A protein has these predicted regions:
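Hydrophobic core residues within well-ordered beta-strands of beta-rich domains
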Residues: 11, 24, 50, 63-65, ...
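Short beta-strand-centered aromatic/proline hotspots
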Residues: 26-28, 64-73
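Short, charged, solvent-exposed linker or helix-capping segments at domain edges/interfaces
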Residues: 80, 96-104
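Short, solvent-exposed secondary-structure boundary/capping segments
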Residues: 37-40, 74-89
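Short, conserved beta-turn/loop elements at beta-strand boundaries and strand-helix junctions
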Residues: 33, 72-78, 95
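Short, well-ordered loop/turn sites that connect or cap secondary structure elements
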Residues: 9, 44-46
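N-terminal helix initiation/capping motif
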Residues: 1-33, 102-137
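Short conserved beta-strand and strand-loop elements enriched in small hydrophobics
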Residues: 13-17, 48-63
Length: 137
């Protein structure tokens, strides 16, 4: 399933990005099982491939992923409408880490007005391990 089918959750988790010898710190603004919008002072260029570690505060664990920059706000304004940062698409991420993101996104979004099809898409990732309770009939 493509990133456009998963809803984006406003989860603000600390991120450390490694790009060769350069290390960049940031924070996720939105996150889903396939991609993340990361706010950082110096976004990378399009198509750069990075190694990243996302710290999941509530679970006291981190997620490691290899990702590609698919959008970068390097030169635009840095304001509430268009915050300085970049969107990365996960190229390599373990299925367990993808499930952690899906579960946290689901928990964050289930009380909001989100298309039920999109919530069900998150559930398909989580249900393999039976980590959420089924919906009441």
């Amino acid at each position: 399933m493509g990133a456009e089918h998963y809803p984006k959750a406003n989860l603000k988790w600390p991120v450390v990005i490694q790009n060769g010898k350069r290390s960049i710190e940031g924070v996720t603004l939105t996150l889903n099982p396939n991609q993340a919008y990361i706010r950082c002072a110096k976004p990378l260029k399009l198509y750069e491939v990075i190694e990243m570690t996302i710290n999941v505060p509530d679970l006291d664990r981190s997620i490691k992923a290899r990702a590609e920059v698919v959008f970068s706000n390097i030169h635009g304004p840095d304001d509430q409408i268009s915050q300085r940062g970049m969107i990365v698409r996960f190229l390599e991420i373990s299925s367990d880490d993808r499930k952690v993101i899906a579960k946290e996104a689901f928990e964050h979004l289930k009380s909001k007005e989100v298309d039920s099809y999109q919530l069900e898409a998150l559930q398909t990732i989580i249900l393999e391990k039976g980590e959420i309770e089924p919906k009441a009939a």
